[in-house]
Amino acid sequence: MRAQPRTASIQASLDTVTKKWWLYLLLLLLFFVPTYASKSYDPEKSIDLIGQVLSAPLIYGLPILMPVAKLVPLALAVGVLLYGNRMRRPFNVYVAVLYLALAFLQTSAVTDTYGLVVISGNLALVLIVAVLWVWEVVAEKNDFKSVRRPKWRWWVAPLAAISLLAPVDATTMSPDFAPLRLITNEAGLTYCMMTPVVLAVLTLFHPSVNPAVLRVSSFAGMLLGAVNMIVWFGLESWGWWMGVMHIPLVLISVYAFALSHASTEAM
C-alpha cells in the first residue's frame, strides 16, 4: 500500500518540475556538451564527425531488427487504439526499451577517422526521455481507454505514417519509395522518425496521458527537429529531402508540447 502514495508523490514532483522553464533551458544546454571521440579531432570537423555517427550508428549493426522495429510499433499503436489499456504495458515497455537503446546505440559509432565517437549531448537528452518512459512503465499514468475524440485530432496520423515509412535513402539523402525499403529501412531505429509515432498516440489520448512524459518527449523532439532543420535546409542543403523527413517531428512535437502545457479544463 505504501508504493501507491510514493508513486503518486514522485509523479506529482515530475509534473511540477516539467512545468518549470529552467528545466528546458538545462535540456537545451545539453547540446553544448562536447562530443567524445577516441581520436583527437579538429573542432571544425564536428559536423563531419557527427554525420559519420548518424549515418552508421552502432544500432544499425543488426539490420535484421529494422523491419521488426517498424512492424512492432505499428502493431502496438494500432493495438492501443483498438484495445486501450490492455495494450498499455506492452506499448510503454516497448517505447522505454527503444529509447534506452537509441540513447546509447544511435548516438555512438566506431569510425575509421575518429575511432569510437559518442554524441554526448544527444545521449544525455534521449536518456532523460528514456528514463521518464521507464518511470511510466512503473506509474502507468497513460490511460488509453476508448474515448471519443474530435476528427481534427487525427491530423497527426498521416504525418506519423510518413515518419514510420521514411521514404529516404540514408546514404544519399535522396527520396526512396521502393516498397521493400519502406519496410526495411532504418527509420524504426531512429529517435527522429519514431518519436512522431509515439507522440501521435499520446496526443490522441490527451489529456489522459502522463504529462511529464509528454512534455519532455515532445521538447526533445522539438530540439532535435530544429537542429535537423538547420542542418538539412541550411548547412547541408544538398540533403534537403532528409529535412523534409523531419518536418513531421517538428510539427507533432510542437503540437504535443503545446498540448502538454494547455489547461485540461480547456480540452
Protein language model features and the residues they cover:
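Structural signal for the C-terminal ends of transmembrane alpha-helices
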Residues: 78-86, 134-142, 168, 201-209, ...
